[in-house]
Amino acid sequence: MVVVASLLVTALVAAGVTLGILQLQSRTNPQQVNLRSGVTISEESAVTQVAARAKPAVVSVVTHDQPRLGRGSGYLVTSDGYIVTAVNVVAGSSRMTVLLTGDAKLHDARLVDYDCQTGVAVLKIDQVSRLPTLAFAPDPTALVEGQVVVVVGGPLEGGAVTPGYVSALHRPVTVTDPVTVRTVEISDTIETTAVIGSTTAGGPLLNVGGQVVGVAMQSQGSSEPGGFGLNVADITDDVQQILATGHVVVSSLGATNTDLSLQTAALGGLPEGSQLVTVDKTGPAGAAGLQPGDVITQLADVKIDAAHPLRLLLRSQFHPNQRITVTYFRAGNSTQVQLTLAGQHPSCA
């Protein structure tokens, strides 16, 4: 078994080194860097420094029980082996291993918990200590369009570094639930010109200060030329909950929903908000009389819009067992109702 693992690591590292050499060669030509990512030569020094500081904390995640080996990235958030990655990296896998930077050993990893509403997953490797870590940006709301960001991949990819810009915020993308393998839309991601492949997905999206502002990810079936990132503003609470308790619990209406942009809502003669798709009759929404088709426009005094989607508001500004006022639209009329929020693992429906 040790021999097999050794051969596997050797083969994977060899492939990663080859890829890393090719990417390094392309990065040493400033014109190629500019053409690919739009990052100017004056920013190269900052990008290089960020990558050098981040690489020791970036890992490769290998999934073993698919038709072929799957490879992605992640990064350490604690010195004893907790790793943040994207749900797409581990979707459908029951056996995962992790390769640390500067290590030749594959460490068995387990999925601690995940949230397919935000797209984040947390893994754990055991019998490790004093590992380097990366920190979340202290003010993720400071992220703006046009800001320089850097994606760093794991050691199997030669620590691939891809710089780029934040091209848009609050973009919807589709990901896969790692347990049920169903797809779900995430409504608040970062779009970047940095090219993100399947092997760098799950790695950190960093600002020029070397702080994590997102988690790199691929969108299923996307035709966009760049990549996407899970916004740290949305995943921080999840990660903290998982580290503290081993699982994620968020406030819930007991209903599934789809967000309506201002443009989409206008086409249907509806207000901007979140339209209920299914309602559990025994849950808070059902007990309060809400029905499928109702459009939630406000929770308490917070309006539902592209920057404040319903699911993220429920997790960020409210808590289970809290009594709130819900404003909703039905048949041309706006109505308010009071209900008490439930607590549950984030729904992936």
Please state what every model-predicted region is.
Residues 17-82, 86-88, 94-95, 119-120, ...:
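N-terminal activation segment of mature serine protease catalytic domains
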Residues 25, 186-191, 195-196, 243-313, ...:
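PDZ/PDZ-like groove recognition
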Residues 65-71, 78-160, 199, 223, ...:
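Conserved active-site neighborhood of the chymotrypsin/trypsin-like protease fold
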Residues 31, 45-50, 208, 212-267, ...:
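C-terminal cap/linker of serine protease catalytic domains
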Residues 125-136, 162-225, 234-237, 259, ...:
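Active-site region of chymotrypsin-like
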Residues 92-111, 130, 142-150, 158-177, ...:
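Beta-strand/loop subdomains of soluble extracytoplasmic proteins
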Residues 58-62, 84-87, 143-155, 190-195, ...:
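Active-site-proximal beta-strands of protease catalytic cores
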Residues 1-27:
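Hydrophobic single-pass membrane-targeting/anchoring helices
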